Design a protein with these regions (language model features):
Chain A
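Extracytoplasmic/periplasmic solute-binding protein
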Residues: 137, 141-145, 150, 174-220, ...
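Conserved N-terminal structural module of periplasmic/extracytoplasmic solute-binding proteins
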Residues: 2-102, 166, 279, 290, ...
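Extracytoplasmic/periplasmic substrate-recognition and gating elements
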Residues: 228, 232, 240, 277-340
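A structural signal for short loop-to-beta-strand junctions that line the ligand-binding cleft
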Residues: 82-83, 90-91, 122-157, 186-187, ...
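C-terminal capping/gating helix-and-loop segments adjacent to ligand/active sites or protein-protein/ligand interfaces
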Residues: 343-344, 361-413
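Hinge/lid segment of periplasmic solute-binding proteins
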Residues: 98-150, 174, 282, 286-288
């Protein structure tokens, strides 16, 4: 009998807690413009860099970041989503552009940054192209924390031994791959978990940027004959032995160092990992922008990834967070950040520490290149999850691409139907 | 009347009624407040559509329908069953073996130590070191290569081999705990029946079957019960080594739940999987424990 | 009264074989530990995965130093130590009390109550993280040591109750009856009779739960924020990610460092498992 009472007691406690939960979250903005700002990030490995930046922000803006790093990106997303309901909603946090940010903006959870952007664009601190990524319904939200271009890294020693130059056309890249395979060297790195999308992204956007755009808006189906053709090309390359063993668990930076493969298609933040693995920038490794698959394209498409720095609308530190965001955009902050982190800077007036990254920044800014959003941010999350799995399965066991594409398209159909 | 003062053990109906309640109360309260209340919230969410923002919207059993409709869910269930069977067979079996071998053996406690050390290695360490061993061209392949076996399978890519090797990696970590629990069981066995059996000339396997095994039952129930529960919610090692891939080949139920909740922000669907997993686990545990425990000691 | 000294149950040749089997198996078990150590000792700049079995150089200390610098590990040690000691101690006592109530005091519907407590372990921890975070931040328990101790205690109780309940069923009920005849109260019987008899089980539960808490990553990640409250493994995990950060050998070195205290704990508590129980004292 008593045991039957257990659920009752628990149910009572639960309804009490739900009552609590229904009282909305968030705190009053305390209006402070100086002091300690609580900052949450999913780039936990950068925590020491943010701490280093505090020296500059303390003296210039009188704001100190109190950084909490989350090493698990998925747990982090859930934590931030939940925090909007509590009085812990963050004064400053990192997020993803694309549909994930749109979702928060639609719920009115993000503080507007239009004024900050207007000032930054007027001062020539940031390009109008980048502003587009942060614009929703004509207003801006968040500021860019980091920016990365997806390029091809290569082992310079291998290229030198084989007498290979950086390719300028897709055909040259293919002949390099053939030549390396002939010499018993695997040309490209690949993995069957998480980073499974980049080659697909590269070939689709490099064939036709509009086709790529269509995939992310649902106008183009994954089973479109043009997409199937691209997958067939990928399959041919897999069968020709152009890609590394999908079962390898070696860290990609170490793999490139020890010559497991000659090239890796990765974001420009990869310099940090390669340096850490003991390779010297410009000596042991270098990078090139991957030529477009379709030689008739006027501009070479380059995938760009940009991580925003956002302020919660209902945070008690909203004013402080926005004050910091404004400072963040300045050349002074960006130069200090580039020194601490060693990454590409979005602000052309900032000084970049690594000459290779400096050069990359100038190259892609020219009219010969066209930036497009990385597949990871451009694709709605449910479709992305399935696509990453399916590309992973394809990479592990390459075969007829149709079943993989059909599975992705089934999820896409569901998703777009729900959006109606 | 206070039961504490009762001096007649078989008096009245239940002289320790209140005393017993007092002893169990802290345990029940702690678990109820910190674990069951959040679980009820999860159960509520499983009947709603919720993305972590705004308010949950009641949709009835739709999430459950969607869950059973998904062919990948079935694969997940099968993998989870493989984990349950595998962990009962390997870590429990070896754990019992080690406990018996070290029992009453001079230096036995020290010989047991190597099996306990892996338990001390943190989860991050375990996933990293086993990826390192099992990856293509990794430590295992290098060792096999040295003995002339070069054509090794892709341990972490080919299904269901990847699940099998991950079960073995889990066994590596879990055997010591099971051995320790069995050892405690062996220690609680009274000496008289053992002496008597030995005087009768019983040794080895007969001694084990007739005396040790029946007397180990309470602790066997612990080890098997924990093993079933732990294997049904296998998550860390799979997330650390294959992330359920390639595709969804090595996904377990806990991983499917995690993906829906944390990756896709489908809190309702994720919660539905969690509820399903909880019911299955509880049912398995009750069925097993009822049979093992209630016959002898309680009414 | 049975004699305390127990004659070895098997003959000496069998002992040798047993020792040999255990030694071989034990060495096999230590192979991954060996790989962990030698690879944690390799300098990140020269680290490769092509010669996993051979030690190449000894940079263990500098790797450990780097791991501590990157993760702010030093700040976490004290609070993690508090969690790993306080929570299991409470949980062991609470669990033993529950087992005592069910077995010795023959609590009515004991099995149902037992299942109610044990049920606390059956669902995946990931599912209760978000409601816990929500509740914690409303009750000002988020990012406090008290909050961490509470949650660690709660998740350790079911295991502790399970083991203690089953351990106590191995003790004849007349032990309890004899104590009652001596005029002891239930509290006294619990603390003076049952707990001492269960010392090896209590120690086993303590070290297993302390290790579990010491190695916890998930609860620390969601329920804490500041360096002084965050447990050690959560801090450690922070230094590794796709976006740069620590190299493999640094991660391994950090993992090794974190594991050391638990290995020492195992070493120190071994003597509790060396002998059988003296059950004949009543």
């Amino acid at each position: 009998m008593r045991s039957r009472k257990i659920p009752l007691v628990v149910a009572a406690a639960a309804s009490a807690s739900m009552l609590l939960a229904s009282c909305g979250g968030g705190g009053e903005d305390d209006g402070a413009t100086t002091g300690t700002l609580d900052f949450y990030t999913n780039k936990a490995a950068w925590e020491p860099d943010f701490d280093e930046l505090n020296a500059a922000s303390e003296s210039r803006a009188d704001i100190t970041l109190n950084t909490t790093g989350y090493s698990d990106a998925e747990q982090y997303d859930a934590f931030v989503r939940q925090s909007f309901r509590t009085d812990k909603s963050p004064g400053l946090f990192t997020w993803q552009t694309g549909p994930s940010l749109a979702e928060l903006v639609e719920e009115d959870l993000i503080a507007e940054t239009t004024d900050i952007w207007t000032k930054a664009v007027d001062s020539g601190w940031v390009s109008t192209d980048l502003r587009e990524t942060y614009t929703y319904d004509g207003k801006q939200y968040c500021v860019p924390m980091n920016i990365a271009y997806w390029v091809m890294y290569y082992n310079k020693n291998i290229f030198a031994e084989q007498g290979i130059e950086e390719p300028t056309t897709w055909a040259e890249l293919n002949s390099i791959a053939e030549r390396l395979t002939g010499a018993g060297i695997t040309p490209y790195y690949q993995t069957s978990t998480l980073f499974t999308f980049q080659w697909f992204q590269q070939m689709v956007a490099g064939t036709d940027p509009e086709l790529y755009e269509g995939l992310s808006t649902g106008e183009v189906k994954y089973t479109d004959p043009r997409i199937v053709d691209i997958m067939e090309t990928w399959l041919d390359q897999e069968e020709a032995g152009w890609f590394s063993d999908a079962g390898s668990t070696t860290d990609p930076a170490v793999g490139l160092k020890q010559g497991d493969y000659a090239m890796i298609n990765f974001g420009s933040f990869f310099n940090g990992s390669l340096d850490g693995a003991g390779m010297v920038s410009g000596e042991d490794y270098d990078m090139f922008v991957i030529p477009a698959t379709n030689p008739d394209l006027e501009q070479t498409p380059v995938a760009v990834e940009s991580g925003p720095l956002c302020v919660a609308e209902n945070s008690s530190q909203k004013t402080l967070g926005l004050t910091y965001s404004e400072w963040w955009m300045s050349p002074e902050a960006q130069t200090a950040w580039s020194e601490a982190r060693g990454d590409v800077a979005f602000n052309p007036k900032a000084t970049v520490a690594d000459p290779m990254l400096e050069e990359l920044g100038t190259t892609v800014a020219s009219d010969d290149y066209q930036l497009y959003d990385r597949y990871y941010e451009a694709t709605p999350t449910p479709i992305l999850t399935v696509a990453l799995e399916q590309f992973g399965a394809f990479i592990a066991n390459p075969g007829d691409p149709m079943p993989f594409l059909e599975t992705i398209q089934a999820e896409a159909d569901d998703y777009w139907a729900e959006q109606e | 009347m206070t039961s504490d003062k009762a001096t007649r053990p078989k008096a009245a109906k239940d002289p320790y009624h209140w005393s017993a309640r007092g002893f169990i109360a802290p345990g029940v309260l702690g678990v109820a407040v910190l674990l069951y209340v959040p679980l009820l919230w999860t159960t509520f969410i499983s009947f709603t559509e919720y993305n972590g923002l705004g308010d949950p919207e009641w949709i009835g059993v739709e999430n459950y329908v969607e869950m059973f409709d998904d062919p990948a869910f079935l694969g997940s269930v099968l993998n989870t069953l493989l984990w349950v069977g595998g962990t009962l067979l390997v870590p429990v079996g070896i754990g019992l073996g080690i406990a018996l071998l070290t029992w009453n053996l001079k230096g036995g406690t020290w010989l047991r130590l190597p099996f306990l050390i892996p338990y001390a290695v943190s989860g991050i360490g375990v996933a990293v070191i086993w990826s390192f061993i099992l990856g293509s061209g990794g430590a295992l392949d290098q060792a096999l290569g040295a003995f002339g076996f070069s054509d090794t399978p892709r341990w972490l890519v080919d299904a269901p081999l990847n699940t099998v090797v991950m079960i073995l990696a889990t066994a590596w970590q879990g055997v010591g705990v099971n051995a320790l629990l069995f050892t405690i069981g062996l220690q609680s066995i009274p000496k008289e029946p053992l002496e008597a059996a030995r005087i009768d000339g019983a040794g080895g396997f007969r001694l084990f079957r007739s005396i040790l095994w029946p007397m180990l039952r309470p602790l066997t129930a612990v080890v098997v019960g924990l093993s079933i529960v732990a294997s049904l919610k296998t998550f860390d090692i799979v997330q650390g080594m294959t992330k359920g891939g390639p595709g969804r080949d090595s996904e377990t139920l806990a991983l499917t739940m995690y993906k829906e909740t944390f990756v896709n922000s489908e809190y309702g669907l994720g919660s539905a999987i969690a509820v399903f997993l909880t019911i299955v686990t509880l049912a398995a545990a009750i069925l097993y424990l009822r049979q093992q425990l209630s016959s002898k000691h309680e009414g | 009264m049975p004699s305390k000294s127990t004659a070895p149950p098997f003959k000496s040749t069998a002992r040798v074989i047993r020792t040999a089997v255990l030694a071989v198996l034990g060495l096999l078990w230590l192979i991954p530990v060996y790989l962990l150590i030698i690879n944690a000792a390799k300098a990140p700049e020269t680290f490769t995965t092509t010669h996993s079995w051979r030690p190449t150089d000894f940079s263990l200390l500098s790797n450990i130093g780097e791991a501590m610098r990157l993760s702010g590990l030093a700040d976490s040690v004290l609070s993690t130590l508090v969690y790993a000691v306080v929570s299991p101690v409470i949980a062991v006592l609470v669990g033993a009390a529950a087992g005592f109530a069910i077995v010795a005091l023959r609590l009515r519907h004991g099995f149902a109550w037992f299942v109610a407590i044990f049920g606390g372990t059956v669902f995946p921890l990931q599912m209760i993280l978000l409601p816990l975070f929500d509740a914690y931040s409303r009750m000002n328990l988020f990012d406090t040591r008290l909050g961490m101790i509470l949650v660690y205690t709660a998740i350790s109780i079911p295991f502790s109750a399970f083991v203690m309940r089953n351990f106590f069923t191995g003790i004849a009920h007349n032990v309890f009856e004899a104590s009652v005849l001596d005029g002891a109260s239930t509290g006294r019987i619990f603390f003076r009779v049952y707990l001492p008899m269960a010392s090896s089980a209590l120690v086993a539960i303590f070290i297993l739960q302390a290790t579990f808490i010491w190695n916890d990553f998930l609860l620390g990640l969601v329920l804490s924020q500041s360096d002084t409250v965050r447990p050690i493994v959560t801090s450690l995990a922070g230094m590794q990610s796709t976006y740069g950060g620590a190299q493999m050998s640094t991660v391994l070195a950090g993992g090794l460092l974190v594991s050391l205290p638990t290995v020492v704990l195992f070493l120190c508590t071994q003597k509790f498992f060396s002998r059988g129980l003296a059950l004949g004292q009543y």
